[in-house]
A protein has these predicted regions:
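Catalytic core of the metallo-beta-lactamase
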Residues: 1-86, 145-149, 155
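Accessory terminal helices/loops
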Residues: 55-69, 77-157
Length: 157
């Protein structure tokens, strides 16, 4: 009843893979390595391509069910939430999650989010947020342009 499926997820690197765990044919959990993180996505410094990463995220991760569990390769949650809160300061879910992290040692605690939580706190999945677009001054930009702008801003963060 359990199946582990290998998914080709280029972008962070051109050969990146994720592992999707299915239960009775339905997505249950994904092990994302460095492609997708709590509140963020991977960088493209090691031979990756941000445009391909956009395609991977927009065609794969956005289609997963809300209850899918996400196991990233390692933790950037606090830093990623700081980025989200800076560029989307009216994101109440991200602000609340940041409050939840106060006093938490992320070297000892690892958060396993669901896709639903990620859709609320992950700036790279919120490319239609009016508050984000206004903050970035990209109200007329395509989702791809917004993603690429965010990826470049996150590279400098």
């Amino acid at each position: 009843d359990w199946l582990l499926r290998v998914l080709f997820t280029p972008g962070h690197t051109m050969t990146h893979l994720c592992l999707l765990l299915e239960k009775k044919g339905d997505p249950y959990a994904i092990f994302t390595g460095d492609c997708f993180f709590n509140a963020g996505v991977g960088n493209c410094h090691n031979g990756g391509d941000p445009e391909i990463l956009f395609q991977t995220v927009s065609t794969l991760f956005e289609k997963f069910p809300d209850e899918l569990l996400i196991y990233p390769g390692h933790e950037y949650l606090k830093h990623n939430l700081e980025f989200t809160n800076h560029y989307e300061p009216m994101n109440l879910a991200a602000l609340a999650f940041s409050q939840k992290l106060k006093g938490v040692n992320l070297d000892e605690v690892f958060f396993i989010n669901t896709m639903n939580v990620e859709r609320e706190i992950n700036t790279f999945l919120r490319l239609t947020s009016k508050n984000l677009l206004k903050q970035l001054k990209l109200e007329e930009a395509s989702q791809k342009e917004i993603f690429l702008t965010l990826r470049e801003l996150r590279n400098q963060w």
